[in-house]
């Protein structure tokens, strides 16, 4: 924010500077245009400034102008006098214009030598007409006091020797100020009359043919404002050698700029002008001789006098008539006034009206310069107001900057504190991340354990299913065995009935045998055949009466009876013999015969009893094998029941743990890490498996303790 404000202020300052530069350029262009309209082209004009002791100085006055036909560098091939002015302009970049509080302005120092030498030369002379730039620079006020405020313009004509014109050496008092670096362009000129001195105050000098006997050097410094950006200041090509028997005020003079200056006409002492119109040339010659000035030619002719003629258009040219004279200086020689003591005589053709016209023009020019000074003063005031506003703006910006800087420092402190807090939070976050990673690892381990337990539960479920299927198979086999046992029992019962019938028959037969034995014994004693018929009928009744006897259920009795019957049959068979021819029972001990049909019945009964005994043995063997098989199945069933009970107890324990975990409060659902690791996680698949297994157990044991415990848990 502060940088944006400062950049905006800088842009405003740059815009003001650009406007000021444009204004300065415009003023410089207007002044250059006005100077070009009021200035006449000259070659080299010279004025003589006479010091109080009579010393003469050659100083350039105003910008040096060439004629319309000459270029910036013009080479003259004719013999002319080399008028040199030594003025080294200061560096444009090292000297700046300083504006004082009282409105004064200082200019750069100008060095002058103490002698004037006009040296003739027959060689080519290159005249550099570039205007010399002397920028405004800082000059001490104390050093400016050593310089004469008013330079004495002394006319070298013989009419007013000793008469001085007081004028301000610089036209700064009239207000000629420039916003840019101004240039001081000194030019020298040789004026033929005092009128031309005033007329050509801008520095446009004429070297007249009638005035070269006594050169007049006018000194005025006009300030021009060339575009310093396009042409920097350069040393002047003119040099002035001032030799005087009495020294000047100082070898190095300094000028002081005044806020106000006296009128130019008042400083020229116009009342003494008539006295200067008729001065004798010898007086002037003596004056010049006593002052120590020397005009000498450098072509070997010795001291000579300058003569010339005025052109028809007014300004004189140094190059006119150069080839008509064998001596280069003869063209400037005047036939009216011979040389006396090496000094050229002067002319006395000054005219007062022309001088007044020139002074009027000069005064108008000074008024213009005064107006320009006022305009520049207004510009200066505006610039000062702008500078004050910029200064106040700068102070406000400085205050704002200080405030912003304080805020920025506070923000930096806040940022540092926040950065430290962020670092602390980052440390906590890192610890939380480590804990989260540990918890993630624990969760992964718990998931793995739960998967392992789920696989174990699934394997147990498969085992339980296989056990259940085996149990069902055994139950079916047991039922089949029981049905077979029942069928065998029924067969045994039927066989027992048949056996009992046979036993009863055997008993009846034994009784009949006894009866028959008794009858045989009686027959042997009585021998009657009628008794045999009676015995047969009685035997038949006995056989029929023995058919309804009860059959004993006990196996040992039947076996005993069987053994008894077999023994009886053996005894009977041994004691009796059946004779098939007679079909009569014959007893060994008795001599009676048994009918054949009876013997056949007895034989059939014996075979039937034998078959029944064999079948009984087979049934006993099958029953014993089935009993052993049933015992083995019962033992296997007991073992499977024991295993199922163990698995049921384990499943009940797992179910109880699951229900206990589900019944834990939400605050206790975040146990310690070690507790989580020690506790066996329960997989989600185990619930369904446990429910299915419990259902099977309830079906298998409808009234057992498992149902009671499971109902309590559920």
Curated annotation (Swiss-Prot):
Which sequence ranges form a coiled-coil region, renumbered to this chain?
356-525
Alphabetized InterPro entries for the sequence = BLISTER
Q: Where is the sequence biased in composition, kind Polar residues?
A: 36-50, 58-74, 219-253, 288-297, 313-322, 519-561
Q: Does the keyword Coiled coil apply?
A: yes
Q: What spans are recorded as compositionally biased (Low complexity)?
A: 562-576
Q: What happens when the gene is disrupted?
A: Pleiotropic phenotype with defects in cotyledon, leaf, flower and seed development, slow growth, severe epidermal defects, including loss of cell adhesion, outgrowth of cells and increased cotyledon cell size.
Record's Gene Ontology CC terms?
cytoplasm; nucleus
Renumbered to this chain, region (Disordered) spans: 1-113, 219-261, 288-325, 519-576
Q: Where found in the cell? A: Nucleus; Cytoplasm
Taxonomy, superkingdom: Eukaryota
**Where is it made, tissue-wise?**
Expressed in root tips, emerging lateral roots, shoot apical meristem (SAM), vasculature of cotyledons, leaves, sepals and carpels.
Report the protein name in the record. Answer: Protein BLISTER
Instruction: Give the species.
Output: Arabidopsis thaliana (Mouse-ear cress)
